[in-house]
């Protein structure tokens, strides 16, 4: 399991970044508020990671957070029946707007 990734942002999309760690680019889904703060940084960034293998869709998704507490909240939310990773990410975004 991947706990965190540290590297340089090579590309940022609407809701994700591609993080270059040692020559390998990882696509990491993040909340837009974090995207805005990370896109201004040229230095290395560290993202705490939740990884998810979706067998039905055949995808491997990663969700990144700048704080361990946000990742813990994400894990708590996804443990609730009916809340998937995408909805949990939206709820974490709402929580971060109070920071």
Predicted stretch roles:
Residues 11-98:
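Long, highly charged, low-complexity intrinsically disordered interaction regions
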